[in-house]
UniProtKB/Swiss-Prot annotation:
Effect the entry attributes to changing residue 107 to A: Abolished cysteine methyltransferase activity
Organism from which the protein derives: Escherichia coli O127:H6 (strain E2348/69 / EPEC)
Annotated GO MF terms: protein-cysteine methyltransferase activity; toxin activity
Complex and partners: Monomer.
Annotated region (Interaction with host proteins TAB2, TAB3 and ZRANB3), positions in chain: 49-52
A GO cellular component entry from the record: host cell nucleus
Protein name: Cysteine S-methyltransferase NleE
Cell location: Secreted; Host nucleus
EC number(s) on file: 2.1.1.-
GO process annotations (BP): methylation; symbiont-mediated suppression of host NF-kappaB cascade
Impact after mutating residue 191 to A: Abolished cysteine methyltransferase activity
């Protein structure tokens, strides 16, 4: 089961050159062994050092870039509306689109991935008011972290974030139960079970959810 770390409120920025401190600021329960490892290829875009524990932040690539991204996010930020309208799946088809639709008040929750915990967008997001993140490593992947971003000023925010994690775990369990099946068949069968509700908690348009379910059903019929 996934045990994500939750930021229940906006994280206060810290003035430091040490890479370890900024990660612990948004991910306080991360395992200490993480900092004994050498930075991976994606970390090296933002930090320099023999290990993550002694690494320092790169001024331009992390410090300045995070400041630029935070400034941009503040201009796009909006207070939570009284009600949310469905959005097109295309609006949230990129990492930026996913979090932008949340901070601009279009939907209460979104999800994206980062290839490094030093990603400037992730740190900038965590400092916005009423924007929270649940972070956990993607299984069977040495680099990716899944970020569930949600509005803390809407009751739907954390409710849907928690449900996303439940559905994510359900899909993983189904794929493990189908370990005798071909990988593509496992992926499609598990997707069929969670796809409709997943689309609903992401606030996608009903017609687009229906179209996606039809696509999944057609794909399954071709595989079986």
């Amino acid at each position: 089961m996934i045990n994500p770390v939750t930021n229940t409120q906006g994280v206060s920025p810290i003035n430091t050159k040490y890479a370890e401190h900024v990660v612990k600021n948004i991910y306080p329960k991360i395992k200490h062994d993480y900092f004994n490892e050498s930075p991976n290829i994606y970390d090296k875009k933002y930090i320099s050092g023999i290990t993550r524990g002694v690494a320092e932040l790169k001024q331009e690539e992390f410090v300045n870039e995070k400041a630029r991204r935070f400034s941009y996010m503040k201009t796009m930020y909006s207070v939570c509306p009284e009600a949310f309208e469905p959005i097109s799946r295309n609006e949230a088809s990129t990492p930026e689109g996913s979090w932008l639709t949340v901070i601009s008040g279009k939907r209460p929750m979104g999800q994206f991935s980062v290839d490094s915990l030093y990603n400037p967008d992730l740190h900038a997001l965590c400092e916005l008011p009423d924007i929270c993140c649940k972070i956990f490593p993607k299984e069977n992947n040495d680099f990716l972290y899944i970020v569930v971003v949600y509005r803390n000023d809407s009751p739907l925010g954390e409710q849907r974030a928690n449900r996303f994690i439940e559905l994510y775990n359900i899909k993983r369990d189904i794929m493990q139960e189908l370990n005798y099946e071909l990988p593509e068949l496992k992926a499609v069968k598990s997707e069929m079970i969670i796809a409709r509700e997943m689309g609903e908690i992401f606030s996608y348009m009903p017609g687009e959810i229906d179209s996606y379910m039809k696509y999944i059903n057609n794909k399954l019929s071709k595989i079986e």
